[in-house]
Amino acid sequence: MSQRELVVLGTASQVPTRQRNHNGYLLRWGREGVLFDPGEGTQRQMAFAGVAATDITRIALTHFHGDHCLGLPGIVQRINLDRVAHPVDAYYPASGQEYFDRLCSASSFYRRVDLRTHPIAGPGPLDAPDAPFTIEAVALSHPVEAFGYRLTEPAGVRMLPDRLAALGIHGPRIGELQRAGSLLVDGRTVTVAEVSEPRPGQSFAFVMDTRLCPGVAELAAGVDMLVIEATFLDADAHLAEEYGHLTAGQAARVAADADVRTLVLTHFSQRYRTLDDHRAEAEKHFSGEVVVAEDLHRIPLPPRR
């Protein structure tokens, strides 16, 4: 299977700290590199993380608050400076078109890259040319319009060695069966369905600034990896509700209810000196893998089910 991992470029919320840069997350998915919410300093964090401008194939903004988009000018200019040969697709709330245009034209530079824009007018599937996954936008609840993203690989099949062997299908003939869909064996036709079982594709959800709402659960449902904001702790839930954010406990309860496999917490308020309580709060409610994100960490997607 191709490399699939999350490269964490920044984990702060509104105010960066000495240890935490503003947001930035690159999802590597084979030849795809989806850059989510590049905040200030993302370009420099890419250098530290070993991420090249040519790795970026798509940019996805959840909303137009500065900590989620002020790195966009540098990214757009860098992909042009480095003469990235492939088109780059950009997704963002259509209501922020004015901000997007300003960010992409923040200063003079030579435009060499085909930046294909996909403003999101409402929830639903998005155009993802040549992608090995579908992309869906789901509305969230924040003081400005915000969307979360869900990426889903199409379902496939898993060949069953025991059934293949029982029918005398070995070596190159297995590939022939997979390509053709059926194969003549000892005078009868064997189909792929007879020697395989369904294999669900991998899935990934990205949930940033939002209070609890139906969209959070919709995005999280059954995903292999959920990257979700945990700005506050449950003790400060009143602040989370007031400002349109989540607590670590809320994020963990969502993950538990949704049968998530790997929970990645991020977007932490600068009010907390350590994140030990975030982990403890999450593990109290969620028994799966909990990752408290750190800048420059690489988090592999869990193996296929």
From Swiss-Prot:
SMART domains the UniProt entry points to: Lactamase_B (SM00849)
Textual note on the cofactor: Binds 2 Zn(2+) ions.
Xref: SUPFAM superfamilies: Metallo-hydrolase/oxidoreductase (SSF56281)
Organism superkingdom: Bacteria
Chain positions recorded as Zn(2+) 1 binding sites: 63, 65, 142, 209
Protein name (Swiss-Prot/TrEMBL): Ribonuclease Z
Source organism (scientific name): Nocardia farcinica (strain IFM 10152)
InterPro entries attached to this UniProt entry: Metallo-B-lactamas, RibonucZ/Hydroxyglut_hydro, RNase_Z/BN
Residues given in the record as Zn(2+) 2 binding sites: 67-68, 209, 267
Catalytic reaction list: Endonucleolytic cleavage of RNA, removing extra 3' nucleotides from tRNA precursor, generating 3' termini of tRNAs. A 3'-hydroxy group is left at the tRNA terminus and a 5'-phosphoryl group is left at the trailer molecule
The protein's Enzyme Commission number: 3.1.26.11
UniProt family annotation: Belongs to the RNase Z family.
UniProt-annotated catalytic positions: 67
Quaternary structure (record): Homodimer.
Keywords from the UniProt entry: Endonuclease, Hydrolase, Metal-binding, Nuclease, tRNA processing, Zinc
An annotated Gene Ontology molecular function: zinc ion binding
